[in-house]
Amino acid sequence: MATKESRDAKAQLALSSSANQSKEVPENPNYALKCTLVGHTEAVSSVKFSPNGEWLASSSADRLIIIWGAYDGKYEKTLYGHNLEISDVAWSSDSSRLVSASDDKTLKLWDVRSGKCLKTLKGHSNYVFCCNFNPPSNLIISGSFDETVKIWEVKTGKCLKTLSAHSDPVSAVHFNCSGSLIVSGSYDGLCRIWDAASGQCLKTLVDDDNPPVSFVKFSPNGKYILTATLDNTLKLWDYSRGRCLKTYTGHKNEKYCIFANFSVTGGKWIVSGSEDNLVYIWNLQTKEIVQKLQGHTDVVISAACHPTENLIASAALENDKTIKLWMSNH
């Protein structure tokens, strides 16, 4: 499918379903380093803010998940249990539980308050690389190096469906805001949209050439999909039309599956880590780089945006091992 930016992309893209569009939009963000979180002993793999805004969870190659205070970066607790490195962690909608994906071929469901592992989800035949809850948080989705996507029931820990999704490792999986659709990305160069109830593939987004898809995510309102590919490119798709609306470049991403994000608490930005040790922030509309955050000493593998405040968390690989919290006053 052609990925030339369609003419109607000049129309403003409303990302969030809330009615806060009338806010004064700042010219540029002005994120500055607030604090550095030290605790992991190997590469950090993922950072995620809890939906209630209170906590930050980080996962690492050290097999641990650490919970931190979202605003002050204060160490809260460590979750132990995986046998091999963890690639991803995700929160339930009520911020009470976490799911983690590990090279030990399992996912674990955690009770955050007690720090206990509630269930271990077994069924993948290779590394589990990515995971997410659906909005009601009764289902978990996972993607693996076994090239499948699995849908799990939280209550029982049973696998409900296995989607023979891709012909290479699955790099990312995400539910839309209603929980009716799933998006998956893979090293096979494809981004696929699935019906969550039936497990049917509804659409495949195909790029001009087929660079590996390293990350995918629905926009907050579910109308768009953000994809990252290992040719130093992020793209915003109107997936119902199969059209690429925006392309974001300037960062470095050819090797790692780096998390990207929509920032909607101030202006409308796209935020991503990069292999040149920086966090990049683009204006969603104009595609201009509006800020680069400097401070990490290795690849920034993950960047997360706080649900209500102008806060970004970033995490870096093994020459750094830290998480940084960045704050903007507008």
From Swiss-Prot:
Q: Where are the WD repeats?
A: 39-78, 81-122, 124-164, 165-204, 208-249, 252-292, 295-330
Region annotation Disordered: where it falls in the sequence: 1-26
- List S-S links within the chain: none
Pfam families on file? Beta-prop_WDR5
Organism domain of life:
Eukaryota
Composition-biased stretches, type Low complexity, lie in 11-23
InterPro entries for the chain = G-protein_beta_WD-40_rep, WD40/YVTN_repeat-like_dom_sf, WD40_repeat_CS, WD40_repeat_dom_sf, WD40_rpt
| Placement of sequence motif DDB1-binding motif | 188-192
Keyword terms, alphabetized: Repeat, Ubl conjugation pathway, WD repeat
The protein's matches in SMART domains, at most eight in alphabetical order, are given as: WD40 (SM00320)
What's a Gene Ontology MF term here?
Answer: histone binding
One Gene Ontology CC term in the entry: Set1C/COMPASS complex
Q: Where is the composition biased (Basic and acidic residues)?
A: 1-10
**Subunit structure as annotated in this protein's UniProt entry:** Probable part of a cullin-RING E3 protein ligase complex containing CUL4B-DDB1 and a substrate-recruiting component (DCAF). Interacts with CUL4B and DDB1.
Write out the function statement from the record: May function as a substrate receptor for CUL4-DDB1 ubiquitin E3 ligase complex.
Instruction: Tell me its family.
Output: Belongs to the WD repeat WDR5/wds family.
User: Could you tell me what this protein is called?
Assistant: WD repeat-containing protein 5B
